[in-house]
């Protein structure tokens, strides 16, 4: 019989490593860059991920061409089911899709949405959004 003794910190490190491996690795491109590509794509986990031109054209109408794609939707266990969106342009886009008012003079660059809203966003922008997961063991 083998008895393994680990501290909570060790367990936390292991779990964080597992979550990190689950999350996609990607480099974001600007809307401008993607619009100029014949076959718009980003590399996610070493594989080519096609971006639908229809989504890019839609985003061009509601956002700056400096918008970084994919838009990151962060699922954080410490947020009780909320999904975090960061970045001024990203917040602007998600707000418009959900029909939420935003103060254009606000410096706020973070917003939180919930699962029903996430479904709306993912339906509208399936190839230009990316879910990532963040695990918080100790809040």
UniProtKB/Swiss-Prot annotation:
Pfam families: DUF61. Transmembrane segments: none annotated. InterPro entries: UPF0216. Belongs to the UPF0216 family. HAMAP family: UPF0216. NCBIfam families: PRK04115.1. This is UPF0216 protein MJ1224.
């Amino acid at each position: 019989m083998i008895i393994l003794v680990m501290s909570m910190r060790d367990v936390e490190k292991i779990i964080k490593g597992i979550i990190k491996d689950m999350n996609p690795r990607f480099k974001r491109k600007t809307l401008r860059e993607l619009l100029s590509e014949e076959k718009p794509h980003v590399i996610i986990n070493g594989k080519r991920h096609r971006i639908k031109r229809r989504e890019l054209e839609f985003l061009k109408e509601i956002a700056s061409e400096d918008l970084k794609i994919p838009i990151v939707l962060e699922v954080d266990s410490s947020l009780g089911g909320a999904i975090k969106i960061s970045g001024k342009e990203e917040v602007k886009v998600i707000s418009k899709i959900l029909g939420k008012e935003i103060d254009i003079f606000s410096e706020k660059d973070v917003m939180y949405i919930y699962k029903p809203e996430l479904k709306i966003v993912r339906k509208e922008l399936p190839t230009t959004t990316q879910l990532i997961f963040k695990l918080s063991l100790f809040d």
